[in-house]
């Protein structure tokens, strides 16, 4: 892992290059995704069968997982896993319940009524990855906020394996309250949710992380359906001063690096000795890490340790990066929170490591990546509702303001708008 001693602008340039390298998208992949989406739109289940056999090596007669399979899944998971899942569910619900908002009703003078109605989406699709790792936690993080919002129907898709779907995924789906589960993955699953097929219902919104093909497919169908966000590779920035623990920092950097080779792991520190210790510790921990090949490739391609003169500059650099995850291993981390402008999720102190947020604490782990934390937010209950405004005026109330409306409408050249007001008072031209 490279240790970089640069001024602010040079450090920022290097970091941007790391991110660009992580987000390079082959044009051939984009073309392939576009073709898959179009074929599923046109051929529906026939295309799903073709791509499932091609990409997953599995022939499936019925893509829907039966209720019996879901019930039997609990026989194949550990009691300790169920206990952990229940604890995570409790914390996720308690956190997200506080995000729920009420409809607004505002009654002003002269009988003017204005308001906003908040309603849940009717149905959503949740994508759960099934590649080099299985993610039951993603089921909870995507489904529970939707349930709290009041979504009527939740459909889940996840790639099939030779032996079926990982029972841990099925148990998590059952616990979270998923209504239907389908054995389908990749760009073809996103297309099926967006357009509908003979077997899979069309939904109003698609959420959930996935690989590059899934992310590009979500971009392709956006507008046909809504999506949560277009997630890029996982990323973490750790800011540390001389109080930082090299073992903790190295472990936290590797916790993101093991996701995939395109993940980004960056440490920004004011202490050169700590930087050297972190570098050594990463090498030591990689030797015993089961996913060391993936993590090492990620660290070599997209990892770095930056030396800066002050924590203030470290925070400025982090704000320019706008990372998915930001850890603060510094004295008085709570005092620095006010200076963090852009980050998906912020972890304060040595005992709030990023995996705590990934699995158990309650805040959502579906976060903006690739700098989009500047304008996107973590997944929340708000993502599963829509809002309608309403208003009611009395004749007297409209009469009082009609001249303003007519003036504005005529100024914009929209004379039918003006007439719509005037005709109610016998003033049409």
Curated annotation (Swiss-Prot):
Keyword 4Fe-4S: no
Annotated pathway: Amino-acid biosynthesis; L-histidine biosynthesis; L-histidine from 5-phospho-alpha-D-ribose 1-diphosphate: step 9/9
Positions contributing to substrate binding: 234, 256, 259, 325, 358, 412, 417
SUPFAM superfamilies: ALDH-like
GO BP, sorted A to Z: L-histidine biosynthetic process
EC number(s) reported in the record: 1.1.1.23
Active site residues of this protein: 324 (proton acceptor), 325 (proton acceptor)
Catalyzed chemical reaction(s): L-histidinol + 2 NAD(+) + H2O = L-histidine + 2 NADH + 3 H(+)
Cofactor binding comment, as recorded: Binds 1 zinc ion per subunit.
Residues where Zn(2+) binds: 256, 259, 358, 417
Cofactor(s) demanded: Zn(2+)
GO CC list: cytosol
UniProt keywords, alphabetically: Amino-acid biosynthesis, Histidine biosynthesis, Metal-binding, NAD, Oxidoreductase, Zinc
A GO MF term: histidinol dehydrogenase activity
Binding site residues for NAD(+): 127, 188, 211
One Pfam family per UniProt: Histidinol_dh
Family named by the database record: Belongs to the histidinol dehydrogenase family.
Function: Catalyzes the sequential NAD-dependent oxidations of L-histidinol to L-histidinaldehyde and then to L-histidine.
Protein name according to UniProt: Histidinol dehydrogenase
Gene source species: Bacillus cereus (strain ZK / E33L)
Protein encoded by which gene: hisD
């Amino acid at each position: 892992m490279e240790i970089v001693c640069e001024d602010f602008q040079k450090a920022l340039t290097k970091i941007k290059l790391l991110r660009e390298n992580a987000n390079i998208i082959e044009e051939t992949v984009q073309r392939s995704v576009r073709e898959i989406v179009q074929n599923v739109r046109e051929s529906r289940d026939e295309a799903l069968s073709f791509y499932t056999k091609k990409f997953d090596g599995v022939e499936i007669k019925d893509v829907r997982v039966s209720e019996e399979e879901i019930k039997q899944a609990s026989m194949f998971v550990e009691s300790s896993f169920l206990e952990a899942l229940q604890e995570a569910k409790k914390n996720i619900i308690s956190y997200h319940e506080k995000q729920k908002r009420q409809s607004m009703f505002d009654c002003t003078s002269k009988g003017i009524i204005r308001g906003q109605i908040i309603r849940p989406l009717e149905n959503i699709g949740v994508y759960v990855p099934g590649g080099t790792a299985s993610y039951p936690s993603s089921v909870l993080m995507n489904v529970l906020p939707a349930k709290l919002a009041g979504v009527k129907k939740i459909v889940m898709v996840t790639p099939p394996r030779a032996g079926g779907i990982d029972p841990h995924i099925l148990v998590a789906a059952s616990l979270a309250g998923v209504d239907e589960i389908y054995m389908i993955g990749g760009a073809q699953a996103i297309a099926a949710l967006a357009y509908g097929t003979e077997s899979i219902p069309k939904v109003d919104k698609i959420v959930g992380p996935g690989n590059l093909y899934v992310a590009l497919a979500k971009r392709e169908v956006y507008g046909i359906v809504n999506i949560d966000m277009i997630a890029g590779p996982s990323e973490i920035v750790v800011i540390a001063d001389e109080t930082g623990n090299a073992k903790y920092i190295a472990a936290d950097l590797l916790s993101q690096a093991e996701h995939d080779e395109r993940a980004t792991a960056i440490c920004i520190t004011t202490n050169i000795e700590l930087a050297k210790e972190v570098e050594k510790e990463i090498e030591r921990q990689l030797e015993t890490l089961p996913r060391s090949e993936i993590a090492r490739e990620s660290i070599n391609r997209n990892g770095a340790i930056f030396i800066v003169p002050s924590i203030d500059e470290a925070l400025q650099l982090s704000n320019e990066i706008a990372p998915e995850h930001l850890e603060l291993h510094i004295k008085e981390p709570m005092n620095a929170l006010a200076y963090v402008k852009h980050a998906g999720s912020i972890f304060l102190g040595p005992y709030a490591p990023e995996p705590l947020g990934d699995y158990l604490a309650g805040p959502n782990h579906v976060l903006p990546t690739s700098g989009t934390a500047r304008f996107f937010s973590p997944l929340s209950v708000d993502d599963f509702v829509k809002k309608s405004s309403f208003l009611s005026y009395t004749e007297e109330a409209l009469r009082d303001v009609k001249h303003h409306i007519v003036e504005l409408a005529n100024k914009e050249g929209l004379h039918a708008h003006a007439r719509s007001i005037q005709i109610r008072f016998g003033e049409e031209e």
